[in-house]
Structure formats: structure tokens, C-alpha cells
Amino acid sequence: MNEDLTNSTEYKRYGHDYAKYPRRIAEELQHYGGNSFANFFRDEGVLYKEILCDACDHLKVNYNEESATSLIEQNMLSKLLKDSLEKMSRREIKELCNELGMTNIDKVIGENKQVLIASTLTLFKAGGSHSYALAVSVADAMVRQTLGHXACYVVGKVALKKTLGVLAGPIGWVITGALVSINLAGPAYRVTVPACVLIATLRLKLKAK
């Protein structure tokens, strides 16, 4: 993000409480994206939704471009979460589920990893604090690997909740490792993809309150 954001009224008012102004962050991304993707260039900056769809295309996310922006964001986060879960062991997925309050997971689905993954994704799509917790795990891992510690600090501010303690430990690092294989070719994708993930997470935080 450039200095337009830090000079904005929203930044001066809310500082590092980024969840208070996801719309302003999205506007900043529009102008960054407008300079980065010649195909979408417009004088007023490309629409955030176009950058989001471009990121989803790059990540091979299944979505409908006619859908609401928040639904496309959910599809993107679901895809990243699913890819992460696929690379986790049954034990690691169960640990994550238990930490998120799915305490009867063993009795319901036994040892079937695919059902574990499906159950976790269902929990994510249900919304609320669990959805936000899972989104933060993806956002933190994505930003940690692409934008560096400065941006990781941004997500850290978002993630300060007791319910997210498990994500700061081994499970969080497993998810980080699973995301390392994502191809973010070129400097533009290394900024716009994690930025879209971060904006989607901030939006979920607002809904979770």
C-alpha cells in the first residue's frame, strides 16, 4: 500500500484497527491494481472486484463473477483453506476442529480425512467467529510468506483474540507450509492476492462482531 492510505482520514482515525475500514483499503488496492494490470487499467483505478476476480483466476478458484464480492471472497478463502487442509494430517485437522469447538468431531466422522475437510469447510461457510478464525489462519500464512513481517504485523493486529491461540502455534505453521506451494508469479500477484485475502478477512471480522 502506498502513502495515500496512511494519509487518509480513516487511517488517522482508526490507526491499526484495520477492520474498521476495509472499504478504504480496497480503494487503495484498486489504484495499485490499476497500475499493475494493464488489462484493467482505468484512470480512476480498476474496480476491486476485478482485481479479486483476477486473483481468483490465478488461484484457480471456482466462482461466478456475477456473484456478490463477499461471496467471491468466501470462495477464494474456501479454496485456500481446502488446499491447506488437504496437506494436513488427520490428527492436525482434528486438532484444529477441536480448538474451534467441534468437540464431537471424532464420534461423528471417525477417521475419514475427506469428511473432516468437508466438515471444516462447512463450519467456515457458516460464518461467525469460527469463520473469521479460519480466515485469519489463511490470511496470516499468506501475508507471512509474501508481504513479509511488516504486513504480517497488520494481520497480527487483526488476529488478537483468545479463540485464535491455536493458529499461532503448530497448526498455523502447517497452514503456512501448505501455502508455500502457491504460485504467485510476478510482483503484482505477490501484492494483490494477499491484499485480497486480507480485505476478505477484515470483512469477516466485521460480520463476526
From Swiss-Prot:
InterPro entries: Ubiq_cyt_c_chap
Family: Belongs to the UPF0174 family.
Designated name of the protein: UPF0174 protein HP_1587
Organism: Helicobacter pylori (strain ATCC 700392 / 26695)
